[in-house]
Amino acid sequence: MKLGIIGLGAVGTANKKGFEHVGHIVVPHDITLDTTIQDVLDTEITFLCVPTPQADDGSCNTGILESVITELSQLNYTGIIAIRSTVVPGFTQRMINTHRNLTICFVPEFLRERCAAEDFINNHKLLAIGTHDIWVYRKLVQVHGTLPEHTEHLTPNEAEVLKYYNNVYAALRVTFANVMYEVCDKLDCDYTTIKNAYIKTGKATDMYLDVNPNLRGYGGMCLPKDTQAIASLLKQLNLDFELINSVHTDNEKFKKTVFNGMRS
């Protein structure tokens, strides 16, 4: 199958390598390459992997993504547009309603920043597809081949919330682990010994629970901005909960010992 990928950051590059591994022809477009958006017009599916950075108010800035979708609409792209970029819940449905000449779905990724391509090919736990169209769902399942262990058919809103659920829960675990690390330090207990004992209860894995002097709070491109985006969304929804704000505030106390991407 001939696929397009717009945006060759960590996510776009991982998608490119992964789909080439499956055997597809991949046509990339990125502002750093000598390419144009017209290059993807004859592809069956185009994956949008452009940045959705944090806005000044903490919300998710979808400006770049919206401009790409608008351009594809103006060019009458006839393939499936699969949004990989993280977006606020409701965005995909808004794009579907706005650009009725396009076929748009949301396909979140759950890749770790430091090993995204490896995860796409060898650690692809879940393929979640947010669409109302069963044909689109089946087409996305087909293009991923045998890489995903599980597939899930969701609505666009559900898939968007799932992406934030994944990242914010990761941030919550990191912050909880760091707080308990401080408790252990004050009580002259070995945090790793306690953490490893807890893992043996079978109630959790040790993912995101490792803490040591050189590995503290979360960093990277995703967890900080996504945590603040959900905090901003809570305000928009008039939900008065402090948990997410507290996660971000407490993480700032540990951030100085984090290498970029280590906790992604």
Predicted feature descriptions by range:
Residues 1-42:
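NAD(P)+-binding Rossmann beta1-loop-alpha1 motif at the extreme N-terminus of oxidoreductases
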Residues 41-45, 76-79:
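Short acidic/histidine-rich motifs immediately flanking catalytic phosphotransfer sites
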Residues 48-51, 85, 131:
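Glycine-rich, N-terminal phosphate-binding loop of Rossmann-like dinucleotide-binding domains
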Residues 232-236, 249-264:
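ATP-dependent carboxylate/acyl-activation modules
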